[in-house]
Amino acid sequence: MNANSTTTAIGLTSPFEKLSFFPHSSNLILAHLHEIIFSFVFYQLAFSVVAPFLNKVVFRKHYTTIRDPLLKIDFNVHTVSMIQAVVSNTVLLPTLTTPMHYNVVTYTDSYSSMVSSLSAGYFIWDLTMCVRYFKLYGLEFTGHAIGSVYVMLLSLRPFCQPWIGRFLIYEASTPFVNINWFIMQCNAKSKNSIPLWFNVVNGLLLMTVFFVVRICWGSIASALLFRQMWKVRDELPKFSAVTMMSLNIFMNLLNVLWFKKMIRIAKKLAKPAPTSKLD
């Protein structure tokens, strides 16, 4: 099987392929536009309808008594993020069977394009939330959303499609990040409303998974991708290659920054509470 193998060689096809608005277009963004739109609408409905319902059922008074509208929005956004992490980690699994040595410039298949499109739809939604509530999410999350949208759309050039699932696997740490956030919000209102053991277990899983998939694998994957690009350097679209690697470096640095914050929080929580001396 050569490096330019297409979807027919490995049997990866999008289940939504027949719903395309532009089924005969050679432009992958147009061919998969329906998946981008579907994904955006899906997550908007999840934010507006599903998340509020789930939060009322799961968190009860911790959610229903919130008076700060921004905090309630943040609750809903974190719930949507949980849904997206489950969806993303499920749909990306078949893409991990795509050999890494396939040509990063020419390789594409219908299924990987679908994964990119569904992810692009989510990150476009995420970007709209970051812009709309910039005071809440700030420059870090907005920058992350912009970079993610760009990378997903760039993969529909096509570019680096064999690596889509291998970078989206970062989302494996997202559920633990969100659970940690929910625990902090619940305990802020009612101290120890979440058992300490549950908090500790989730915290350990969060730091372990985050370190493995985002710090370790993130660095290794970036190095391997750079090596793959170097092998086909004469074919590379220069601007796309430079921006892709720049964004990889940016994302890796951002992950290191977030991991350092986790360590600081963990150290703070591990410190025993000060006790007053009895005279």
From Swiss-Prot:
Give the disruption phenotype, in one or two sentences: Leads to cell death when overexpressing the camptothecin mimetic TOP1-T(722)A mutant.
Q: Name one GO biological process term.
A: lipid homeostasis
Q: Per UniProt, which keywords does this protein have?
A: Membrane, Transmembrane, Transmembrane helix
Report the locations given in the UniProt record.
Membrane
State the membrane topology.
Answer: Multi-pass membrane protein
> What ranges does the Extracellular topological domain annotation cover?
1-32, 101-110, 157-162, 214-238
**Keyword hit for Transmembrane:** yes
Domain named TLC is located at: 70-271
Keyword Aminoacyl-tRNA synthetase on this protein? no
Query: Transmembrane segments in this chain: where?
Result: 33-53, 80-100, 111-131, 136-156, 163-183, 193-213, 239-259
Q: Name one GO cellular component term.
A: membrane
Which stretches face the Cytoplasmic side? 54-79, 132-135, 184-192, 260-279
User: Which family does the record claim for this protein?
Assistant: Belongs to the TMEM56 family.
| Name listed for the protein in its UniProt record | Topoisomerase I damage affected protein 4
User: Native species of this protein?
Assistant: Saccharomyces cerevisiae (strain ATCC 204508 / S288c) (Baker's yeast)
